[in-house]
């Protein structure tokens, strides 16, 4: 297990080294979020999937394998992030996921809430004593996962469920952070988003089962 001091030292080095790309990714995420909210469609889907594919690959390889390497990131984070990256890339052609704000007002509000928290990650960490460069910026692996969960949960039922499922383990594994692991309490946001994502995934799964049961008698009646 990586020590708390070593973790935050490596975060600081990563920020000081990679800040131009980290800032560019944050701006790109903000602009693409605007498109999802106000101009959803095929072009927005394409650009968002391409961005997410790159962001997950970058974090999986550069952040986990090079900058903040430890057993958990190497053997759990890397495979999960690379798989998610590949699935977003594949979905550019498959077109299973369509990003947009949900119709229900409560769910729309939650989507905005989660994405706002992503961009507020550094501010959440500030009163906890995490100031730049030793702070988690919006497109770090954990806030990026929150960002993706919010987007795919909003897209339900028009979503590749494999992506949805693969996003959840990394989020739910953040529970120890809520009890002081690595002095990274801001990742309680990540854990909470994982719980939210799991609830939405189960709700969608149940809704699909109910719809399938209701459709079966109709099909039998037509066939008969």
Protein language model regions, located:
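Membrane-proximal helix-loop-helix units in multi-pass membrane proteins
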Residues: 74-148
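N-terminal topogenic module of multi-pass integral membrane proteins
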Residues: 1-69
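Hydrophobic cores of alpha-helical transmembrane segments in multi-pass inner/ER membrane proteins
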Residues: 20-33, 79-95, 143-155, 189-206
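Loop-to-transmembrane alpha-helix initiation sites
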Residues: 73-78, 180-194
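Aromatic-anchored segments of alpha-helical transmembrane domains
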Residues: 54-62, 113-124, 168-180
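Membrane-interfacial loop-to-transmembrane alpha-helix junctions, especially the N-terminal start
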Residues: 41-53, 102-111, 156-167
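Membrane-helix boundary connector in multi-pass membrane proteins
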Residues: 66-69, 153-165, 171-187
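Membrane-interface capping segments at transmembrane-helix boundaries
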Residues: 38, 93-99, 201-218
């Amino acid at each position: 297990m990586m020590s708390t001091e070593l973790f935050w030292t490596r975060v600081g080095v990563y920020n000081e080294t990679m800040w131009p790309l980290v800032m560019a990714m944050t701006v790109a995420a903000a602009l693409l979020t605007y498109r999802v909210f106000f101009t959803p469609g095929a072009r927005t889907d394409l650009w968002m999937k391409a961005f997410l594919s790159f962001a997950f690959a970058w974090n999986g390889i550069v952040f986990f394998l090079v900058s903040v390497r430890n057993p958990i990131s190497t053997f759990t984070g890397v495979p999960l992030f690379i798989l998610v990256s590949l699935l977003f890339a594949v979905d550019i052609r498959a077109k299973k996921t369509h990003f947009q704000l949900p119709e229900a007002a409560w769910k729309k509000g939650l989507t905005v809430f989660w994405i706002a928290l992503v961009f507020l990650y550094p501010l959440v960490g500030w009163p906890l004593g995490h100031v730049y460069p030793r702070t988690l910026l919006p497109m770090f692996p954990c806030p990026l996962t929150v960002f993706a969960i919010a987007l795919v949960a909003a897209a339900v039922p028009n979503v590749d469920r494999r992506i949805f499922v693969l996003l959840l383990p990394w989020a739910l594994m953040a529970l120890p952070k809520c009890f002081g692991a690595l002095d990274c309490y801001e990742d309680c946001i990540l854990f909470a988003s994982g719980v939210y994502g799991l609830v939405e995934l189960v709700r969608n799964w149940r809704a699909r089962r109910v719809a399938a049961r209701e459709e079966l008698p109709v099909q039998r009646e037509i066939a008969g």
